[in-house]
Amino acid sequence: MSGGYELQRTDARGEGVFATRSFQVGETVMVGVIEAELDHNHAHASQLSEKRFVLHGGLIAKVNHSCEPNCGIHLNASGAHDFVARQPITAGQEITFDYAMRNYTVEHFAAHCQCGSPRCRDRITGWKDLPSERKADYRGFVAPYLTDIDNQDATERAGSPRTDRAGVASPDRPDPQRRRRGDRVSKSRRLLEATSMA
């Protein structure tokens, strides 16, 4: 036992992490520590940015998914994910989080979700596939880059270029303003050429 939680067997989902004391809403339940950098997404990967995947050390990697989780995610100073209570947790209760709180896409769980929650989505999905009301419910308890991607996508749909946090247009996505300026210059050149030929 360590820090208010321990590993136990569950009835249907193998091992899980269970609280050995109570936790209040907003209280840090587990502190994340990055154990290794990964080159791709998989069942135990935590996504820290659009292209960065890591493996968390300790029992945090054993926390099971739930479509109605009692924990969410906050980034700590090292960039790892801490698990924070989003509901009161009592001693003996399983500590859970939604895998969509840390990964934009989840494609490695083909079987049906086994969380047993009344709000079960039937399959484990990533943030990208969450309904908007669930995203709103999780606000403040997800990896920040997930909401950054949503904001960027909304900006793109509105016709603005995709930018990084500093507001710089991404090189792989052309700036529509630059394209429009180029179109105006080309049109001006054609008019000038037509006038000079007349």
Please identify what each model-predicted range represents.
Residues M1-A198:
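Conserved catalytic SET/PR domain of SAM-dependent protein methyltransferases, capturing the structural core
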